[in-house]
């Protein structure tokens, strides 16, 4: 029963079927329903603009996954939210981060498939029981962001289109696809914040640990992400699904540091007592935002 409940977090995280649109307390949202793509099914994309947004100056851009969960607990499936609008407003108003807009990309029922990195699957040992019911579509999801969504955003809003102003953030499998994007598109993204990254790849099996599966993500990152080539933030708690991440995340940290990553480019935080949920991600949100956007 516990495993079933935890696995459901991966599938349901970010899923929302409410008709009501999220509302924000700070800034404003512009909503694009059924944003088209030739790579993945259409979906809603929301653009958060900070207070006082003007086309007279340029802004950094933060691309975030699970857009349904970012702004309004009233319209999310679990009545929790990231509170990204409040966090961004507070940090920008105090001058702690650069002026930035947020692109919130809704997920679909194929969330795990779209957030599953195709190339990492190739690092898995033969016969591994990983994502047994889905085909990895992470490459197509990233093509959507890079080839279709980003050009639209840069042509519609007053952004800095250059790499050094383009960022990613996500949690769980959203953290997985964010770090993968740094490897696939190093010329596009300058950094990623990966909260509670699902670095074990498979559904948690405490009764059947598979170190080879857990090593696949670590090996891919170490081999494909050039040392100090970007900003990478990672963290985890130790409750609910996060309880299974400690060993794999510690190995990733050790590998990156052994490769030469310094504290200006790689940051890791451990949050005792924190669970795999939006309430806990919201509580620590200023930390990764400040690391990326200071």
Range-by-range predicted roles:
Residues 1-26:
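Bacterial Sec-dependent N-terminal signal peptides
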